[in-house]
Amino acid sequence: MSKCLHAPVEFIATEIFYFADQVKAINSYSQQSKVISASRDSELALFKGIEPIVNSDNTLPQFCHQQISIMIMADSIDLLESRVAYISQRLVKQGIIHVREDINLAQTFWSQLPGNFNYIRRVSYNIIDNVAALAALHHYPVGMQHSRWGRSVTIFRTECGTPYFMNFHDESAKGHTCIIGGAQSGRATIANFLLSEASKYSPTILYLTNRNNAQVFIKGIEGTWHNGDLPFNPLSYLESSDDLLELFKIITGNYFNNLTDSEIECITELAIAVMDMPPESRSLIKIIKDFNFKDYSAGASVKKRIKLFISDDKCSKIFNQSSTLELQDNNVTAINLADYTDYQFNQSYTPQVGEKPEIYHNKLQTLHCLRSGIIFSLIKKFSLLASSEPKILVVDNMPDLIVEQVFMNLIKQITEQLSENNGIILSVVQVNQNDQFYYSDFWKKWLKFNNTKIILPTNIRNLPIAEICNLSTREAKKFNTISPNSRLFMVKQDNNYVIVELNLEGFPAIRKLLSAEEEDLNLFHKIMQKIGDDAPSAWLSDVYDQFQNSE
């Protein structure tokens, strides 16, 4: 019956049963057993399961009279005929013997009502253990109408046309969510759609990315967008010596070349000293000058590591400037970290003639320390915002931003701290072919911390998303039936899964507002230059019209 519950057909299934005389019932089963034995069909005998009932040495099982009816409904005769044939076909595929009523049609209809035993026409014997074996009506997930933040984020339409109440949080009230899919699968569109629907909670949003496709969306929800130079110093964002210690571990390369116990002791005291400094005075140049490294046996090596870090121009600029970027409650802040990614580094890096390979490696490692330090301090500052209002940390293209060696041992602390402060992480992940990241210990650990997973099909052949997402055999079988062009995707939450749809066909402007391509961004910037006002009320309608007509 579960297969029928998934069908796009309205019906009522009714089961009627009442206790039967034991002797009469066992005689009926004995007659059936003799007929089957005469047929010499051993498989049929095994399938029917009559022998164990007839030959049981134990107390006779309890018997009952049983009738099951399925009443199918439709608005026209033709549609009714079609639906009857559809349900009948599904029952046949599952080996369920059934008949279509004609002469007894009226009696069978009235027999569905309580107490109308005189109208029952198709009863048969059954053992009481088989009663009420239709299906649990709650078997098909419907989500939760309310979560920790209030009403559900949105309502998706399932593949069967039923509603699914979508929430970041599961039944344990943990809301970390990961959106996974291949290139051009619609990951950003779904992520930003969920963010727009979550605006009813008035959340504080920190949006970390390495691309510009969400720029129109962020500005449309009155957020601020930061490209290129970052107007903040990570040292000034941290509010505890423990967090400063972690930051110093990151920028001194501890996760690539472990610090000794003596070096850890030195940077621990350094973190305490920096904590006593006013946030606006925390520049690495000043710290190196003021802190007495000579008092520590490993002071010289720690100082050397810090100097090596700020010998890089980007590192020096970030860690020696004043902070003007403020993360405030109920605000939306987006930061494009493209200039700090491996891709941008490889695009701009030109090795010197005769340069040793380790120089490239060391510079890339310094970039990893810088990017990790920036992200760590931003997340810490964001997590500890005083407001109890919802917080959403978005990490777009997570594998391009997160350095797994650094964050491997930090993700548990980060996810738990955000949850305690009414926050969630919404990570967006593009799965690429032959990328070892998705087989790493970090990725396996990350999946465990995400209570909700949204998994999108892809056009890339032989891309093992089911394996990467650790789907069960049943889940993988279902996921592999989804066409990439169907606009369907899988939501996995609370040990259940459901296939839902986000169909924006016919709404090109909304799709582009959620995730803009390069030509859309160019059009947006032209309109902004013409209008000269950043307020969404001044430009949003014009941009919408242009996007709608540019399809």
Descriptions of predicted regions:
Residues 1-131:
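Extended, folded cores of ATP/NTP-driven motor/assembly subunits in large transport
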Residues 15-16, 69-79, 94-107, 182-185, 225-231, 341, 399, 425-429, ...:
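A generic structural motif
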Residues 53-60, 166-167, 321-324:
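Short beta-strand/turn micro-motifs at beta-sheet edges
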Residues 108-164, 210, 215, 219-225, ...:
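P-loop NTPase motor domains
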Residues 160-196, 205-213, 224-229, 345, ...:
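Conserved P-loop NTPase motor cores
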Residues 201-202:
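Conserved SF1/SF2 helicase motif Ia
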